[in-house]
Amino acid sequence: DLKLIGMQFIIEGLALAAFNTAKAVTPDPVLKDILHLIIRDEARHVTFGVNYLEDFIENLSDEEKEDRAMFAYEACVISKERLFPTDVFRKFGWDEDEAREFSNNAGFASEFQRLLFSRVVPNLSRIGLLTDKVRPLYDKLGVLEFESHDPDGDISWAELEKPLDLSA
């Protein structure tokens, strides 16, 4: 189950954020269509994890749930921090906090984080991994606001199976 949490939620969430970012900025219509198909496929992977883990997590002890909740939180912290090349900041003698703030205010990092955590956080909430113990940590991380977004477990399989609409 830790592999599913890591892969189906965090890694696939990173992939979805990356592909959605690329789709939003590319002027190439063919690449946009290809990215649309990739995003649909990645969404299926996330949905599988949500649907499976929702039932699995329900049957764990409170201690086991907390372990998984902390694992997911730590993975989110790592995912958020990977957007900032702090080793580069240090190499050039830049203040890490100032460089991180500048990078965040430049737009790309904050938009990528929004795309990532607007998928990951509601999914973690749906499967019961936003526990009372980790909820304040997510709040401090600045991503708890995404809890009310739609989780991926409700994705329409019929919609995902439709062929690409080329008229748009």
State the predicted function of each range.
Residues 1-7, 36-38, 104-106:
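A ubiquitous short alpha-helical element
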Residues 20-37, 51-67, 94-102:
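Inter-helical turn/loop segments and adjacent helix faces that build the functional surface
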Residues 45, 49-54, 114-117:
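Charged/polar, low-hydrophobicity segments characteristic of intrinsically disordered regions
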Residues 1-25, 79-84, 96:
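Alpha-helical bundle segments that constitute or directly flank the non-heme di-iron/ferroxidase center
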